[in-house]
């Protein structure tokens, strides 16, 4: 039986999570995208704690006209990098959450690199 697009993503996510884990020294940058918004958070898996988080939804309250396109996703990446720098986080492990490294997911990664995070 053929898997749906979301079921296939969930299966990829499980395979990736077996290999990728965040620590206190190098936490995990997780990206989630919906049809309307892009969410990013930095997680320490050993403690089970979210260190910083932001999204186009949160940024849209401050900036009028922020859309969930590649430009908005890049702003999310820049903002998550700024917030991480405030908490003295320089290096992260990128978790694409089962999505293809393309489009909005790639834009978040590029924005985070531009903001100073090291993958």
Swiss-Prot record:
SUPFAM superfamilies: Translational machinery components. One of its GO terms (cellular component) is cytosolic large ribosomal subunit. Coiled coil: none annotated. InterPro entries: Ribosomal_uL18_bac-type, Ribosomal_uL18_bac/euk. The keyword Nucleotide-binding does not apply. Keywords: Ribonucleoprotein, Ribosomal protein, RNA-binding, rRNA-binding. CDD domains: Ribosomal_L18_L5e (cd00432). GO terms for biological process: translation. It holds the Pfam family Ribosomal_L18p. One of its GO terms (molecular function) is structural constituent of ribosome. This is one of the proteins that bind and probably mediate the attachment of the 5S RNA into the large ribosomal subunit, where it forms part of the central protuberance. Part of the 50S ribosomal subunit; part of the 5S rRNA/L5/L18/L25 subcomplex. Contacts the 5S and 23S rRNAs. Belongs to the universal ribosomal protein uL18 family. This is Large ribosomal subunit protein uL18.
């Amino acid at each position: 039986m053929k898997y749906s697009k979301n079921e296939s993503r969930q299966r990829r996510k499980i395979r990736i999570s077996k290999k990728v884990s965040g620590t206190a020294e190098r936490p995990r940058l997780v990206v989630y995208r919906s049809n309307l918004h892009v969410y990013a958070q930095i997680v320490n898996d050993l403690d089970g704690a979210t260190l910083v988080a932001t999204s186009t939804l949160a940024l849209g309250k401050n900036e009028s006209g922020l859309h969930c396109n590649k430009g908005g996703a890049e702003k999310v990446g820049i903002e998550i990098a700024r917030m991480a720098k405030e908490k003295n986080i320089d290096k992260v492990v990128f978790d694409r959450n089962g999505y293809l490294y393309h489009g909005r997911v790639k834009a978040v990664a590029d924005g985070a690199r531009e903001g100073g995070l090291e993958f």
